[in-house]
């Protein structure tokens, strides 16, 4: 066998060795890229999901300000709402405006204080619970001499003027009771009515249709 043939055979042998050595790496690389793509896709999708969660509560005004509306977006146009009703959550200090099963606006609120029920021994709010309906009695202001307390922008939902939605309370001089107003959306404090921020109460007085269903829980 001459020298040229030996070199030719040696070259073929080296080429085969190289192909055998590189083959597994090519296989691993081809399998690695799809997995990497899936991981990268999951990483990219995760911030989108977190953003959607954040947006669900992004309209609530923080910190709570009883001088302003509870949300930073406009109040709902009730002319476009098909099934309007209200739910008041006494324990969580929130009033929810609904269109069917969908919450369309949330208001910070303060309901009645909790007292021990002599029959059950359990704490119970002085605000009645159950299903009620908005009544025609409403106005820009009132003052209760016996309680030495008043409020602005009220609308009745029980006993025709006894239980109301209204603003945070006012004192005898007509000024807002800032100590009581600071409880809005944080804790209970009323004598049975539902307190709202000043703009929220004003919207209720002007826009709440007579006969609107109001469910109060807590």
Residue ranges and their predicted role:
Residues 40-42, 49-52, 135-136, 145, ...:
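Residue-identity detector for glutamine
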């Amino acid at each position: 066998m001459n020298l040229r043939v030996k070199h030719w055979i040696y070259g073929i042998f080296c080429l085969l060795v190289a192909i055998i050595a590189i083959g597994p790496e090519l296989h691993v690389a081809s399998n690695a890229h799809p997995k990497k793509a899936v991981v990268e896709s999951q990483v990219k999708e995760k911030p989108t999901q977190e953003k959607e969660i954040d947006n669900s509560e992004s309209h609530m005004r923080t910190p709570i300000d009883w001088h302003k509306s509870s949300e930073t977006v406009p109040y709902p146009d009730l002319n476009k709402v098909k099934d309007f009703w209200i739910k008041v959550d006494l324990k969580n200090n929130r009033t929810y405006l609904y269109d069917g099963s969908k919450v369309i606006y949330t208001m910070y609120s303060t309901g009645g204080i909790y007292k021990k029920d002599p029959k059950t021994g359990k704490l119970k709010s002085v605000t009645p619970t159950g299903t009620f309906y908005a009544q025609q009695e409403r106005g820009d202001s009132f003052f209760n001499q016996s309680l030495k307390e008043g409020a602005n922008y009220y609308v009745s939902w029980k006993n025709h003027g006894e239980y109301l939605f209204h603003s945070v309370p006012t004192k005898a001089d007509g000024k807002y009771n800032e100590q009581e107003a600071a409880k809005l959306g944080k804790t209970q404090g009323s004598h049975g009515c539902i307190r709202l921020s000043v703009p929220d109460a004003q919207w209720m007085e002007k826009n709440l249709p007579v006969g609107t269903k109001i469910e109060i829980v807590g």
